[in-house]
Regions:
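Flexible, acidic/histidine-containing loops and adjacent segments that form or flank the divalent-metal
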Residues: 1-3, 58-59, 75-226, 294-375
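Conserved beta-strand hairpin/beta-sheet module of binuclear metal-dependent hydrolase folds
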Residues: 1-63, 200-226
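Short, solvent-exposed loop/turn segments at the edges of secondary structure
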Residues: 11-13, 95, 199, 244, ...
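Short alpha-helical segments and helix-capping/turn motifs at coil-helix boundaries
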Residues: 13, 80-88, 165-167, 233-236, ...
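Short, solvent-exposed loop/turn and secondary-structure capping segments
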Residues: 16-19, 28-29, 38-39, 75-78, ...
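Active-site neighborhood of phospho(di)ester-bond hydrolases with catalytic His/Asp-centered motifs
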Residues: 27-31, 60-74, 101-105, 217-226, ...
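Active-site metal-binding motif and surrounding structural segment of the metallo-beta-lactamase
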Residues: 39-100, 238-258, 289
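Long, structured stretches of catalytic cores involved in phosphate-ester chemistry, encompassing
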Residues: 226-332
Length: 375
């Protein structure tokens, strides 16, 4: 059975839905950004996700991952999901989470409010009770917090997953035909020992298998080029270059130039070497790059002068690198058109990854396009 990936039009915000071969649903981030203005082109995310659950025959998400706790990744989560820690977040209209994935800061960060506070409370509750959670962290980073609950790392090891590991519970050889390799958060070795880096952000490589074919996607939170370079260096050091291959790349930080370099450039952002190697050498043929963002601005417009992403210069780099491999560059808020953006749905089969009809409401009604990679 094929797997599917869906990217929702939410402006500069992230929500990605993975539908595995067995119809289990994995949600990466939840950002309900649509306002009350009827002209708002951003999708009604709660309705869209309920429709996806119905189409898959599921009443809960196998996994909900909050890749980091900025509002553009979690907005409205405390109003949509069933949280076990408090009855105020429970009710017949709320959607349950079988397993919660969070970065270390969802446990350790003291100064949170709103949706971030609620997610932290739910994460702490599940970790304390020892069920339904994976904390992406170096285990030692959580020792102090576990000790406050009279718990040890060993007692909660099954709830913790570190960089360089596969997330337990998933295999490309089981019914879901999918696995996840953890790149971040990670520890960076310095002269004084290990230093935790990017502990607020999850980055994973997804491998989806069908038949004898595998397809890969790089997915994660808002990280800059320095962190991305360290991920590349660490992965290469451990001989895991294959864990950086990708057919699908969900851009980090809404097509910001800062994920490529500290220098924006006049018309194109030239990446630092490690990032260039990742994006140019490890991309598979006919790759698909998705920018979860507002439309790419035209040169010299007011939007182009805005310091916030998306940045035209970064987009020009991505458009350049796909030309040699017949790839595709998609922007959530301009696909299929700027006036009427729809979810971008990718279908993963033994023939490769295909963009399916973006106006389709569900997998069962989607019309497939030509696969982006053969073999």
């Amino acid at each position: 059975m094929p797997a599917y990936m869906t990217f929702f039009p939410l402006g500069n915000a992230d929500t990605t839905l993975l539908r595995l071969a067995n119809d289990d649903l994995i949600l990466l981030d939840y950002a309900n950004m649509r306002g009350s203005d009827p002209t708002d082109k951003r999708i009604d995310l709660p309705k869209a996700l309920r429709d996806e659950l119905d189409d898959a025959g599921r009443d809960s998400f196998r996994v909900v991952a909050f890749t980091h706790l900025d509002d553009d990744h979690i907005c409205g989560a405390s109003e949509f999901f069933w949280f076990d820690y408090a009855r105020i977040h429970q009710g017949p209209d709320r959607i349950k989470i079988d397993e919660l994935w969070v970065p270390a800061t969802a446990i350790t960060e003291p100064d949170l409010e709103g949706d971030a506070w609620s997610i932290r409370q739910e994460a702490r509750h599940r970790l304390k009770e020892g069920y339904g959670i994976k904390v992406f962290s170096r285990p030692e980073r959580l020792a102090k917090y576990l000790a406050e609950w009279d718990l040890t790392i060993e007692q909660r090891q099954h709830c913790i997953v570190d960089a360089g590991e596969l997330v337990p519970g998933f295999s490309k050889y089981d019914a879901g035909q999918c696995e996840f390799f953890v790149h971040s958060p990670f520890a960076w070795r310095t002269n004084t020992g290990l230093e935790d880096r990017n502990e607020g952000s999850i980055v994973v490589q997804m491998t989806a298998r069908e038949g004898n074919s595998e397809s890969y996607a790089l997915l994660g939170a808002d990280i800059n080029h320095e962190t991305l370079s360290q991920i590349v260096q660490t992965t290469r050091k451990h001989g895991n270059e294959h864990r950086l291959h990708w057919d699908v790349l969900k851009l980090f930080h809404h097509c910001s130039y800062k994920s490529l370099s500290s220098v924006k450039g006049e018309d194109i952002t030239e990446p630092v070497e490690d990032v260039r190697w990742l994006f140019e050498e490890l991309a598979r043929e006919k790759e698909i790059i998705v920018s979860p963002s507002w439309p790419i601005p035209e040169k010299s417009t007011q939007e182009d002068l805005d310091a916030q992403p998306p940045h035209r210069q970064a987009a020009n780099y991505y458009k350049k690198i796909i030309k040699d491999s017949n790839g595709q560059f998609k922007v959530t808020m301009e696909t299929p058109t700027r006036s009427n953006p729809k979810p971008i749905k990718l279908k993963i089969t033994a023939a490769g990854v295909a963009v399916v009809f973006t106006a389709a409401a569900s997998v069962s009604s989607a019309a497939a396009a030509v696969p982006t990679r053969a073999g």
